[in-house]
Protein backbone atom coordinates (compact mmCIF):
# COMPACT_ATOMS: atom_id res chain seq x y z
CA UNK A 1 0.00 0.00 0.00
CA UNK A 2 1.41 3.37 -1.01
CA UNK A 3 0.53 6.16 1.38
CA UNK A 4 0.93 9.61 -0.17
CA UNK A 5 -1.62 11.25 2.11
CA UNK A 6 1.02 13.08 4.23
CA UNK A 7 -1.14 12.08 7.21
CA UNK A 8 1.36 10.49 9.58
CA UNK A 9 -1.26 9.73 12.21
CA UNK A 10 -3.32 7.79 9.65
CA UNK A 11 -0.20 5.90 8.58
CA UNK A 12 0.59 4.92 12.18
CA UNK A 13 -3.05 3.90 12.74
CA UNK A 14 -2.78 1.62 9.69
CA UNK A 15 0.45 0.05 10.94
CA UNK A 16 -1.31 -0.69 14.23
CA UNK A 17 -3.91 -2.77 12.40
CA UNK A 18 -1.88 -4.84 9.95
CA UNK A 19 0.53 -7.73 10.14
CA UNK A 20 3.79 -6.40 8.63
CA UNK A 21 4.77 -9.93 7.60
CA UNK A 22 1.74 -10.04 5.29
CA UNK A 23 1.27 -6.42 4.24
CA UNK A 24 3.82 -3.85 3.03
CA UNK A 25 3.54 -0.10 3.32
CA UNK A 26 5.35 2.22 0.93
CA UNK A 27 5.96 5.91 1.43
CA UNK A 28 4.57 8.09 -1.31
CA UNK A 29 5.54 11.67 -0.45
CA UNK A 30 9.07 12.88 -1.16
CA UNK A 31 8.91 15.14 1.88
CA UNK A 32 8.05 12.35 4.32
CA UNK A 33 9.53 9.13 2.94
CA UNK A 34 12.35 9.08 5.51
CA UNK A 35 9.90 9.50 8.37
CA UNK A 36 7.66 6.80 6.93
CA UNK A 37 10.63 4.43 6.65
CA UNK A 38 11.29 5.00 10.35
CA UNK A 39 7.66 4.20 11.12
CA UNK A 40 7.54 0.90 9.26
CA UNK A 41 7.42 1.52 5.52
CA UNK A 42 9.50 -0.93 3.48
CA UNK A 43 10.24 1.42 0.58
CA UNK A 44 8.77 4.29 -1.36
CA UNK A 45 7.23 5.13 -4.69
CA UNK A 46 8.59 8.51 -5.58
CA UNK A 47 8.53 10.92 -8.51
CA UNK A 48 11.76 12.32 -7.02
CA UNK A 49 13.48 8.99 -7.70
CA UNK A 50 13.50 9.71 -11.44
CA UNK A 51 15.73 12.80 -11.34
CA UNK A 52 17.46 11.96 -8.03
CA UNK A 53 17.60 8.16 -7.72
CA UNK A 54 20.59 8.02 -5.36
CA UNK A 55 19.04 10.34 -2.80
CA UNK A 56 15.81 8.36 -2.67
CA UNK A 57 17.70 5.05 -2.49
CA UNK A 58 19.75 6.46 0.40
CA UNK A 59 16.53 7.15 2.32
CA UNK A 60 15.25 3.61 1.78
CA UNK A 61 18.56 1.87 2.46
CA UNK A 62 19.15 3.78 5.71
CA UNK A 63 15.55 3.25 6.78
CA UNK A 64 15.69 -0.50 6.17
CA UNK A 65 18.99 -0.66 8.08
CA UNK A 66 17.38 1.15 11.01
CA UNK A 67 19.90 3.99 10.78
CA UNK A 68 17.73 6.93 11.85
CA UNK A 69 20.51 9.51 11.51
CA UNK A 70 21.49 8.55 7.95
CA UNK A 71 17.85 8.21 6.95
CA UNK A 72 17.07 11.74 8.12
CA UNK A 73 20.27 13.15 6.56
CA UNK A 74 19.12 11.67 3.25
CA UNK A 75 15.61 13.04 3.83
CA UNK A 76 17.04 16.51 4.42
CA UNK A 77 18.90 16.34 1.10
CA UNK A 78 15.65 15.44 -0.64
CA UNK A 79 13.84 18.26 1.15
CA UNK A 80 16.34 20.75 -0.28
CA UNK A 81 15.48 19.48 -3.77
CA UNK A 82 11.75 19.38 -3.06
CA UNK A 83 11.76 22.93 -1.69
CA UNK A 84 13.14 24.13 -5.02
CA UNK A 85 10.82 21.98 -7.14
CA UNK A 86 7.77 23.29 -5.29
CA UNK A 87 8.58 26.80 -6.55
CA UNK A 88 7.44 25.88 -10.08
CA UNK A 89 3.86 25.10 -11.10
CA UNK A 90 2.54 21.54 -10.83
CA UNK A 91 5.40 19.11 -11.60
CA UNK A 92 7.32 21.26 -14.10
CA UNK A 93 10.53 21.38 -12.04
CA UNK A 94 10.53 17.60 -11.55
CA UNK A 95 10.19 17.18 -15.32
CA UNK A 96 13.06 19.64 -15.86
CA UNK A 97 15.19 17.76 -13.30
CA UNK A 98 14.70 14.37 -14.99
CA UNK A 99 17.86 15.10 -16.96
CA UNK A 100 19.98 14.48 -13.85
CA UNK A 101 18.95 10.85 -13.29
CA UNK A 102 20.12 9.54 -16.65
CA UNK A 103 16.72 8.18 -17.63
CA UNK A 104 14.19 9.43 -20.17
CA UNK A 105 13.65 13.16 -20.12
CA UNK A 106 10.09 14.43 -20.09
CA UNK A 107 9.32 17.28 -22.43
CA UNK A 108 5.99 18.52 -21.11
CA UNK A 109 3.31 17.45 -18.70
CA UNK A 110 -0.33 17.10 -19.62
CA UNK A 111 -0.96 20.50 -18.04
CA UNK A 112 -1.44 23.75 -19.97
CA UNK A 113 1.73 25.40 -21.25
CA UNK A 114 1.88 27.94 -18.40
CA UNK A 115 1.97 25.03 -15.93
CA UNK A 116 5.14 23.63 -17.56
CA UNK A 117 7.13 26.81 -16.95
CA UNK A 118 10.31 26.70 -14.86
CA UNK A 119 11.96 30.11 -14.38
CA UNK A 120 15.61 30.34 -15.45
CA UNK A 121 16.70 31.28 -11.93
CA UNK A 122 15.07 28.12 -10.57
CA UNK A 123 16.72 26.02 -13.29
CA UNK A 124 20.08 27.45 -12.21
CA UNK A 125 19.36 26.67 -8.56
CA UNK A 126 18.36 23.09 -9.43
CA UNK A 127 21.46 22.66 -11.61
CA UNK A 128 23.69 23.99 -8.81
CA UNK A 129 22.16 21.63 -6.25
CA UNK A 130 22.44 18.69 -8.64
CA UNK A 131 26.14 19.51 -9.13
CA UNK A 132 26.58 19.72 -5.35
CA UNK A 133 25.05 16.23 -5.08
CA UNK A 134 27.44 14.88 -7.73
CA UNK A 135 25.23 14.75 -10.81
CA UNK A 136 26.42 15.67 -14.29
CA UNK A 137 24.57 18.77 -15.38
CA UNK A 138 24.36 19.44 -19.10
Positions of PLM-derived features:
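Catalytic alpha/beta core domains of metabolic enzymes, predominantly
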Residues: 2-86
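C-terminal alpha-helical cap/extension of soluble enzyme domains
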Residues: 48, 52-138
Amino acid sequence: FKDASVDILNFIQCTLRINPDEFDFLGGCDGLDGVMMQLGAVGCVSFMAVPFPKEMKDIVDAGLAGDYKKCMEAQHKVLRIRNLCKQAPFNAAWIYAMKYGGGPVGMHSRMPKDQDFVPEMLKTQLDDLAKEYGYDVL
